[in-house]
């Protein structure tokens, strides 16, 4: 499979983080940043925590892609009590 461009800022590469989505030019997992966003962490604080290796535009792209993925998989979701 090699590498794949998912967006302007997000890629997958089997040689980086076992092929998990990361921000281009980093080893920062998109999932880690999305968890920070979900925990209501300010985007500026997220950027600072990652020492400026990601930008607001990169975080925005991750959120938009996650939203599209969720919407496209809604029929597959099972909500439990």
Label the predicted regions:
Residues 4-45:
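A short, structured beta-strand/loop element
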Residues 29-81:
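Long, charge-rich, low-complexity alpha-helical segments
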